[in-house]
Amino acid sequence: MVNKQQNNLQDIFLNNARKNKIQIIIHLVNGFQLKGTVKGFDNFTVILDCDNKQMLIYKHAISTITPTKPILFADNEYETT
């Protein structure tokens, strides 16, 4: 039996933003907004490039992420069960 790894929507979203160099606005829970491009991410953090400065942002501090242009998903990238 082959196990199919189900992709996480959050990972797909951030990876598409990173690969396509789409600028995003990160809204933090304290009200601050950060605009930049995703350089990398893991389960707990996002690295954002803001004006040639890298910022390590903890995901628990993020309220919302808004892309400056739509991020497209392939039909088979995310499936709900």
Curated annotation (Swiss-Prot):
One of its GO terms (molecular function) is RNA binding. Keywords: RNA-binding, Stress response. GO terms for cellular component: cytosol. CDD domains: Hfq. SUPFAM superfamilies: Sm-like ribonucleoproteins. Transmembrane segments: none annotated. GO terms for biological process: regulation of DNA-templated transcription; regulation of RNA stability; regulation of translation, ncRNA-mediated. Residues 11-71 form the Sm domain. InterPro entries: Hfq, LSM_dom_sf, Sm. RNA chaperone that binds small regulatory RNA (sRNAs) and mRNAs to facilitate mRNA translational regulation in response to envelope stress, environmental stress and changes in metabolite concentrations. Also binds with high specificity to tRNAs. Homohexamer. Belongs to the Hfq family. PANTHER family: RNA-BINDING PROTEIN HFQ. This is RNA-binding protein Hfq. It comes from Clostridium beijerinckii (strain ATCC 51743 / NCIMB 8052). The gene is hfq.
